[in-house]
Amino acid sequence: MKKKNSGKKLNVLLTIKKIGINGEGIGYYKKKITFVKGALPDEVIVCEIIEETPKYIIGKLVKVKESSPYRVEVKKEYAESGAYGLAHVSYEKQLEYKRNILLDAFDKYYKLPKPDKLVLKTLASPMIEHYRNKNQFPLAVRNGRVIAGLYKEGSNDLVEINEDVALHENGNKITNLAKKCLGKYKVEISTNKKTYGVKYISTRTSFYNGDVQLTFVANTDKIKNLDKVVNEIKREAIVKSIVLNVTNDNDHLVMGSENITLYGSDYIVEKIGDTKYELSAKSFFQLNPGATKKLYDKVVEFADLRETNIVLDAFCGVGTIGQYVSRKCHEVYGVDIVEDAIKDANNNVKLNNLTNCIYVAGDANKIVPRWKKKGINFDVAIVDPPRTGLGHLAKNLLDVDAKKIVYVSCNPSTLARDLKVLTRKYKIRRIQPIDMFPGTAAVEAVVELIKK
């Protein structure tokens, strides 16, 4: 049973031993594992115990008595929001910690043979600031001003952010202009389910040409004076698309199913390597285009495709990876549960003049066996699942019997669990961590598996 520390404050001295999977410092108080956000390995700290369970303690950093040489200053708003869990660490050390986070996940969920040899050094992001192509900021009204930012960790208090150091400069520019215009024309802002208005601002910027798509997320399609906001913002040459997304407040997702284009195109175009992608307001796309090219190049290297190869692209999304590798193989079969993603994938096939990519909307667990029954024999299976991992598809991949699997992961824990299943039939050749999100504890990985 969890219990909050409701009595007198209990401050304890702690030596931090390592970094946890979410970027928190880990120490031990009375032999019980203690998690302290903002603390670094080898630091001696004072922390307040704020929660204790039979298995672990959560502490709040009060003071650093002996500081790590790798600690750096971090902007207050990022420390408060909790979104950038390693922003207080030098970048070279972040890369080391991220590899360790991956190793710790394997240690917990699946014991790798010779992990130090299999897990390579983390590939750095080409940019460590202004690397993100997209933001999605909730709105509020404070002292008569419309503000946007990130919620303070564990609360509904909005931390105002006027310049997101991770976001493309064009995204910052248009976000600030949108806030100003919403306030200027007194557009209704909704901060709860009882009011109607604009709830979020989202921008997506193409690193290929600098174009910006601005999306207002609202819980109604009838918003007074939004047309005046659009008329002012569209004067900016970099704005190529303005969209209203209508969301259902009862849904846990930020964006709803309905997009209304208020100005310009339904899409902006991004380019990774020689491949272009049309992206709508709802399209899922990697957030760091520079590091994405590194990731996709690593997929190409690990897949080692031949012109005669047939490739399975599971969880294909808008076709990003499959189309990137398509020029090196005979055919690509892509499947994704999201119908809108498959529509975008087929649009991207036309955009890139490709003739060897086939996309189907549906559950991969049903579609892939159907392809197998039709006599389609996959030489290479590329999988890029969500954070929840492969699920039942892990076992179904064993029946696909591809010579090789290339697994792209955004969650070390589910990766380790899935590899425990896949290694019944496949051998792990190498694991490449890649930093897609500098300043955070997130780490992506590409795994090469070959049939035993």
Annotate each predicted stretch with a short phrase:
Residues 203, 209-219, 276-280:
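Short, aliphatic-rich beta-strand segments
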